[in-house]
């Protein structure tokens, strides 16, 4: 299903022109077939009697902003959101957002500042996660995910609003050297994560 893949602000599909590395081929969370397909796929694994649970990874958009220490690896500077790393602007996303707000996201002068457009994509990823979570929990299995560090950074960098998910556990990737941060940053990030989850799930960091 090539039409299921996320499209950047330049109109390039991650199916044939992925960002950064060849395996960055992300599905668009707003395509109607994506959530049911992934939920069914995960339940097939979760249903096996020797499987206690499932762990999600890369359940997000491609990084609109990479951790600063990785910029040199790709010869880029991301001091602003660049079109080639900003997803998703596929026909489905554009039509759904326009039906909801009357605006075409491709015509937004400052898409990175439009809260409705930001929330639209956060909610789309959350919808997919919740579909998978509901299916896995119906099978009485555990579900967790690797997430970006600190819910506020995750929302900005990869459209991942994991503070509003319903998982059993979260594994924030708190790699301080990726961000040229000291050890004290780890504590702040863990604190934000724990406060956001607020006892609803475990945080392992």
What are these regions (language model features)?
Residues 1-49:
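Active-site-adjacent "subsite" loops/lids of carbohydrate-active enzymes
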């Amino acid at each position: 299903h090539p039409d299921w893949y996320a499209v950047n602000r330049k109109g390039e599909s991650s199916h044939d022109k992925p960002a950064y590395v060849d395996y960055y081929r992300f599905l668009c969370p707003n395509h109607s077939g994506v959530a049911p397909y992934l939920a069914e796929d995960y339940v097939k694994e979760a249903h096996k009697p020797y499987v206690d649970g499932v762990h999600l990874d890369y359940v997000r958009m491609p990084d609109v902003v990479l951790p600063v220490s990785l910029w040199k690896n790709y010869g880029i500077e991301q001091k602003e959101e660049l079109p080639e790393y900003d997803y998703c602007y596929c026909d489905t996303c554009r039509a759904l957002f326009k039906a909801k707000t009357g605006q075409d996201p491709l015509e937004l002068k400052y898409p990175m500042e439009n809260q409705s457009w930001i929330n639209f994509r956060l909610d789309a990823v959350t919808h997919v996660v919740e579909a998978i979570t509901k299916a896995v929990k119906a099978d009485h299995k555990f579900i967790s995910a690797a997430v970006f560090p600190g819910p506020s950074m995750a929302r900005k960098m990869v459209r991942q609003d994991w503070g509003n998910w319903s998982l059993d556990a979260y594994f924030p990737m708190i790699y301080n050297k990726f961000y040229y941060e000291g050890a004290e940053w780890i504590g702040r990030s863990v604190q934000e994560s724990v406060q956001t989850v607020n006892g609803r799930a475990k945080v392992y960091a």
